[in-house]
């Protein structure tokens, strides 16, 4: 029973992550200025806390900006 609950929770978490990344991709497609690699104004630097890769200058986020 516990294993089933853990598996269901993991699948739901993965589904939410996929929906979140799909929304971010669509937003970047609509706003071309966000796709520019030279865009650094207003972004967070390496080691800063983040929720989404869009917030980071390098575009990679795992609770903190990676690059």
From Swiss-Prot:
<keyword id="KW-0960">Knottin</keyword>
<feature type="propeptide">
    <location>
        <begin position="25"/>
        <end position="37"/>
    </location>
</feature>
<dbReference type="GO" id="GO:0090729">
    <property type="term" value="F:toxin activity"/>
</dbReference>
<dbReference type="InterPro" id="IPR004214">
    <property type="entry name" value="Conotoxin"/>
</dbReference>
<keyword id="KW-0732">Signal</keyword>
<feature type="disulfide bond">
    <location>
        <begin position="56"/>
        <end position="65"/>
    </location>
</feature>
<dbReference type="Pfam" id="PF02950">
    <property type="entry name" value="Conotoxin"/>
</dbReference>
<dbReference type="GO" id="GO:0005576">
    <property type="term" value="C:extracellular region"/>
</dbReference>
<feature type="disulfide bond">
    <location>
        <begin position="50"/>
        <end position="61"/>
    </location>
</feature>
<keyword id="KW-0800">Toxin</keyword>
<feature type="disulfide bond">
    <location>
        <begin position="43"/>
        <end position="57"/>
    </location>
</feature>
<comment type="similarity">
    <text>Belongs to the conotoxin O1 superfamily.</text>
</comment>
<feature type="signal peptide">
    <location>
        <begin position="1"/>
        <end position="24"/>
    </location>
</feature>
<keyword id="KW-0528">Neurotoxin</keyword>
<keyword id="KW-0964">Secreted</keyword>
<protein>
    <recommendedName>
        <fullName>Conotoxin Cl6.6a</fullName>
    </recommendedName>
</protein>
<dbReference type="GO" id="GO:0008200">
    <property type="term" value="F:ion channel inhibitor activity"/>
</dbReference>
<keyword id="KW-1015">Disulfide bond</keyword>
